[in-house]
Amino acid sequence: MYRRSVAEQSLNAHTMYNPKFQTFSVKNQSTHFEFYILCKGLNSGKPLETPCPNSFVCICKNQDEKDFYFWLLFGLWKAKYFHQLLTGSVIPFIRIDEFKKEVAIQAEQVSKQHEAYTNTINQIKLLEQKEKQILHNLALIKDVKKAMIYRHIKRKI
């Protein structure tokens, strides 16, 4: 009898992810392990935490699977990978079958380097936090500049 090595088992555990992708509908029940993906416009493929019209929903079995696919799609979206799948002349969109196929291909590639991928995702999460913090600080600086100018402006009441 053939026994699998621990490395083979962990690799297979990561490639076993198989989320369900479908067109978002308000009528469908939501789960704790789902996120949404824009499917129309130049931001097609962008993962979102909250639903919106013109989106797909990715339904996962657990939090690990959700994180895996959310950040995979985030990376593909940032790299403009989905632009090659866009169809339509006025409002470009992605067909769900093409989307599923490409996501499956990319998930398989990434799962072959699971540890390196996980490290990259952790670094991206930190960078996202820093970016939000910097944007918040820039908004505060903008408000302070306005306040400094308003001190010198005569107001009509």
How should these model regions be labeled?
Residues 69, 100-150:
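Amphipathic alpha-helical segments
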